[in-house]
Amino acid sequence: LLTMEFGFCFAKQGGNIMRIVELTDESKNNILENLLKRSPNSYGKFESAVAEILLNIKTNGDEALFEYTKNFDKADINADNIVVTEAEIEEAYSLVDPELIEVIRKAIVNIRSFHEKQKQYSWFDSKPDGTILGQKVTALARVGVYVPGGKAAYPSSVLMNVLPAKVAGVEQIIMCTPPDKEGKVYPTTLVAAKEAGVDVIYKAGGAQAVASMAYGTKSI
């Protein structure tokens, strides 16, 4: 009999609760059925709201982006302060525990090592009749990464999104992450982005940030 074990974590305000579920042949159908109940069909009420945001960003660019940032993040962001400055990054380093910075650096080494093993390479094979077969692997010139914010910092999201792109050879990596009410980004997120090699960091969150990276605005 095939036996698999999965741990499901449930977070609760004021404390953490972890429920360990043993996934066996006898129990897996019931467990998987419960997981599959989280169907995309229930997302319909969000799709229309997101579609409206996408269209507004595509049509109105920065104006819509800054308005959404004000409404959702309560931050006054404009063309002059949307890009995280080197001074802000330096300040972030002064606020993050040096031990945590070392942990981030060790994680970078481990993650890079893993993705290096996944990397594909170009190859070509010439046949006697002149036919050339092969594979040409070319990295994207530019990649946009989105990192959540809100009530917590997610440095792991930075590393897991940025490092595969770096290993692949992407020339420029930009990152969007939401600001707090003061227009600042979590220090840990900034440190992780700097260590991972992000080229430009924008103070923008939500669907409006993803849309801005996809369609482009004057600032992004």
Identify what each model region corresponds to.
Residues I17-A141:
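N-terminal Rossmann-like NAD(P)+-binding subdomain of aldehyde/semialdehyde dehydrogenases
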Residues G197-I220:
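Conserved NAD(P)+-binding/catalytic subdomain of aldehyde/semialdehyde dehydrogenases
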Residues I31-E33, V147, E195-V200:
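Short, basic, glycine/proline-bearing loop/turn elements
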